[in-house]
């Protein structure tokens, strides 16, 4: 498991990179497509997850999940595309999907981009913008439409969160914590 998010109904979604670095050479890491997202639910309100289903399967190292109404937005490794999935019959397995944002292969550092040197995060902030790490874009999801806009600065690939006022905090390989003291809406683009 590499990432956990909750939807508005308390269901937990867990991204699993099942092929990540299974040996010292990384054999199959980006080719096996055995990543998945599990959905866990508490059926009786006791705070313990009673049911787990494989919500989406056969993914290429899923690295971002964001609940949107009754959809779950997902981005995989080596692509900038965002695909939304939903379960329409209540069995806990996604049976419908749609492309929210199509931008094609991830190529920030060339075609052989490292698994670590790619975006993650997908954090919905209080300014109604969706922030990700490492890439200089942020997104907005309104009326079923996913829009991207450039933002200044360089993030990190490891973690992103915000406080109650919308200040962004992130970490990287050399410093334990960084923060944006001014909200990104005040940054020049």
Place the predicted regions along the sequence by residue.
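Beta-propeller domains with acidic blade repeats across secreted/periplasmic ectodomains
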Residues: 1-189
